[in-house]
Amino acid sequence: MADQKILWGIAPIGWRNDDIPEIGAGNTLSHLLSDIVVARFQGTEVGGFFPDAKTLNKELELRNLKIAGQWFSSYLIRDPFESVSKEFHAHCAYLEEVGASVAVVSEQTYSIQQSEQNIFTEKPMFTDSEWLTLCEGLNELGKIAQQYGLTLVYHHHMGTGVQTLAEVDRLMENTDPTLVSLLYDTGHIYVSDNDYMLLLTKHLDRIKHVHFKDVRSDILAKCQEQGQSFLQSFLAGMFTVPGDGCIDFTKVYDVLLTHDYRGWIVVEAEQDPAKAHPLEYALKARQYIDEKLLTTDEMKERI
């Protein structure tokens, strides 16, 4: 597994959701990890309900699974750097212990992703001084991540101050490329900008982690028309797994391969598990990846 250029994972968000803890609350860690094995993925990202590192490592070892990384909500604009740094050190120490490769960071100051606000029209905007604070802080967090053998990857996200291509551009232009890399999420940039290729091609050199998230365009249109919140939109089924929506992942994957991308591609599709059976959708994603994306040689490597 370690010799493969690309590792395929699937995020726990299809089973349980940290933003709405009651969603899928009956899905245990053992259930999640065993489903991932059945669907033939190589690993996952850490969810909020995951246990201590020793317990998690035992469960992973039993199933030959790996951890890619974990989300970290930064408040560099709102909070003193010392408090953010302390939390991030603990976050990275845990990730190092479970063998992760990336620390996924998203600035949550002013975020509306957990509020009832219209996710499509009411996103926050940072001032020039706030941008400076954010970028300087991210550079410092990047140094911390490296102390633990991790790469900091920034997650552009709906409902935050770094959502659009223009905002990602500004973040990339004002952070050190040796310290701050990019997580490319197909679904978030498509919902934000109605395009998913430009961000990919423009920032290929900074992309060190990838989320494959598909979008149901009909449900997206309804959610936009109704002015839904982020939580309402994903519960309505705006997001789904690759092959079940409107994004052409063959184009995305071809660009990544051409650029010799190395790292994780994680299927991440937050849905209501009561409506979208997690294992069923994991298997759908696996089938799409096998039939539409992987070459014969890549398939042989996986056997």
UniProtKB/Swiss-Prot annotation:
BP-aspect Gene Ontology terms: inositol catabolic process
Listed cofactors: glutathione; Co(2+); Mn(2+)
SUPFAM superfamilies documented for this protein: Xylose isomerase-like
EC number(s) stated in the UniProt entry for this protein: 4.2.1.44
Disulfide-bonded cysteines: none
Class of enzymatic activity (EC top level): lyase
Pathway the protein contributes to: Polyol metabolism; myo-inositol degradation into acetyl-CoA; acetyl-CoA from myo-inositol: step 2/7
Top-rank taxon: Bacteria
Catalytic activity annotation: scyllo-inosose = 3D-3,5/4-trihydroxycyclohexane-1,2-dione + H2O
UniProt KW keywords: Cobalt, Lyase, Manganese
Cross-referenced Gene3D superfamilies: Divalent-metal-dependent TIM barrel enzymes
One GO MF term: manganese ion binding
Family affiliation: Belongs to the IolE/MocC family.
HAMAP family membership: IolE (MF_01672)
NCBIfam families, per database record: myo_inos_iolE (TIGR04379)
Protein name: Inosose dehydratase
Organism annotation: Halalkalibacterium halodurans (strain ATCC BAA-125 / DSM 18197 / FERM 7344 / JCM 9153 / C-125)
